Amino acid sequence: MSESKRDMTKADANKRMSAGSAREANSTLVMALAGAAAGAFGVWALDRVDWFLWDHEDPKARTQTKAVRPGGEPPAQALVTRSEEATGTVLSPEAHETISQAVHYAIGIAPAVGYALLRDKLPGTGTARGALYGAGLFLMQDEVLNTVTGLGAKPQQYPWQAHARGLVAHTVYGIATELALNLISKAPNKSAATNN
């Protein structure tokens, strides 16, 4: 093979590798965005279940839950309050609530991005995998991280109903996130259709 043909073959191989790397990076970005969208849907579903269960919970359990929460607030609101105190900022009640809701969604979206990128490497399939993801997230966030960061009380201070409600709501979050990712992955790829 002549030197010029060898150089052309090398250049073609480099172009193919670059194109493959670009497709892989694009695929990763698309999957991360899909994870963010699915996570937002998951948080929305979690909220519906959590609020329903909260509204039907024993009033004594609700009172105990509020009493042990830092400042009587759920973790996202407690984080916003802590940020206000650290920066000397005073938000209006409406701004505090809006920012707290954004933080709450961010707390649910961030792990969903990771889940979307890694879910094919995780045990289980379909909604069972989503349920395991949601239950695992409940254990990590609600039972461990909220306590360690001071955004929640020690788990034993909450009534059993709070743990049950959290587990059910987060399991629904995981299933909803998985279903949304499945739906997104089955959507027609318009850019692929226009390139063919």
Specify the residue positions occupied by each region the protein language model found.
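Short amphipathic, positively biased membrane-proximal segments
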Residues: 1-196
